[in-house]
């Protein structure tokens, strides 16, 4: 039996797996055979790793494990298009994964940390603080978990968005190892253009991502177009002011030849006026940028509310005068706490209420 400290095979990229097997005397053929079993055949137990050499299988059983995520709680939206999962990790931590079904395609929103250190005031995860980084296997494991759900109904996954719990660029190494697994041609073989990473604006991470050969999409959570307004909503803005952030974004766009998506959560009376839109338009004018406008998902602990539809339209109209395109992101799963961190917070509140009180 492998120990609790044995290597989780899902934490390894294909080169790392090759290095492990090479130390045992097995070559690239055996590496790729095992890799295909994990990511193409979706093996979940060692018994399902049939076809491997008996000696290799024995070494795997003794020295590695197949880490699995377990469903702790799940909710389904009333329209049937959103499936939110609270997944339990080996140490008891829980993370959120959201499966969203659109016409002819499925998208999954995955987490990169248990909790988050960025502290965005309107985000339920930001109110929790950071517990720990996820390992590459825990990040990829969310995709594998969702793939099993989709396969049962004959569906396939098309898009992955790293917009769940946590800041991906705060867990850079593990997140990028997971991305490398997702795009590996012999594994899940996802196209990089179907993967989007969302960041609050970790400037060193944006610049590093620009310098590396991972042509995924980048989305930046902006929410304010002046330093003061942004820092009031996104405390990380105090560490990386807008001039530094926008310089990094321009560097990324020019280096990678890719459009950057900017996320703007519209909060009634806070950042949804024509004046706010003009300031944002001036900030982004001339960039290859697209704004995703997101009416706020109400969150316990934050008293802000979503903008009215007419305010959303007026905001977009102003952006258009600066030739800045925008899209209103459809809110999904409002009835099942599908906003980041909301399901975890709800389940934990219910658990606390159900605990017996001491005499």
Curated annotation (Swiss-Prot):
Keywords: 4Fe-4S, Cytoplasm, Disulfide bond, Iron, Iron-sulfur, Metal-binding, Methyltransferase, rRNA processing, S-adenosyl-L-methionine, Transferase, tRNA processing. It holds the Pfam family Radical_SAM. Disulfide bonds join 109-340. Its EC number is 2.1.1.192. The keyword Glycosyltransferase does not apply. Binds 1 [4Fe-4S] cluster. The cluster is coordinated with 3 cysteines and an exchangeable S-adenosyl-L-methionine. [4Fe-4S] cluster binds at residues 116, 120, 123. Its cofactor is [4Fe-4S] cluster. It comes from the Bacteria. It is found in: Cytoplasm. Residues 102-335 form the Radical SAM core domain. Its main location: cytoplasm. HAMAP family: RNA_methyltr_RlmN (MF_01849). PANTHER family: 23S RRNA METHYLTRANSFERASE (PTHR30544), RADICAL SAM CORE DOMAIN-CONTAINING PROTEIN (PTHR30544:SF5). Reaction proceeds by a ping-pong mechanism involving intermediate methylation of a conserved cysteine residue. This is Dual-specificity RNA methyltransferase RlmN 1. It comes from Myxococcus xanthus (strain DK1622). The gene is rlmN1.
